[in-house]
Design a protein with these regions (language model features):
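N-terminal membrane-targeting hydrophobic helices
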Residues: 1-169
């Protein structure tokens, strides 16, 4: 899934109004942060590092939440709850829209990539920055259902954004 779609997912989670408005940036960042591994990945296929495994986020967020609990700091606990929800949403949407690499749901117990639709790993043997140009971009949009899903997420987020402002009296 492209970054804009992950950001849209974070925005949609924020719009559920689970926590106060001050947490908006954390919702957005948490839905995107697993993709930071693209900065050190040499190819699209290698882009799903430990940051794309649920065990990493379960351990990190549990430890963070527990520290917040011990210190009796609600903000710390809230931060790690949002981080967990956002990163899990990221992994789930990557699982749904996988084209070249799936999600290792059971890592480190096994190294199997799980995906909803068939993937073509060899199409991901390109530098991560070449995702935005053909031929990868053309390949990415071949699956019309997955493309429609991403476009739908973005449209819903934009509609909610532009129509959620209160109108002056």
């Amino acid at each position: 899934m492209f970054i804009n779609s992950h950001l849209a997912t974070g925005y949609l989670l924020y719009k559920l109004n689970i926590f106060e408005k001050k947490w908006f940036p954390i919702w957005i960042l948490s839905a995107w942060i697993p993709d930071i591994d693209g900065l050190w990945s040499s190819s699209v296929v290698e882009h799903h590092s430990v940051l794309h495994t649920q065990i990493f986020w379960i351990v990190l967020c549990s430890l963070g939440w527990f520290i917040g609990h011990l210190k009796k700091k609600l903000n710390i606990k809230t931060f790690f709850i949002i981080l967990f929800i956002g990163t899990f949403a990221h992994l789930f949407t990557d699982y749904i829209t996988a084209r070249t690499v799936g999600i290792k749901w059971l890592y480190p117990l096994n190294d199997v990539d799980y995906f909803l639709y068939p993937i073509i790993p060899e199409n991901g043997n390109i530098p991560i920055w070449k995702m935005l140009v053909p031929p990868y971009l053309t390949f990415y949009f071949e699956n019309k259902l997955l493309t429609a899903f991403e476009i739908f997420l973005n449209i819903i987020a934009l509609v909610l954004y532009f129509f959620s402002f209160k109108k002056p009296n």
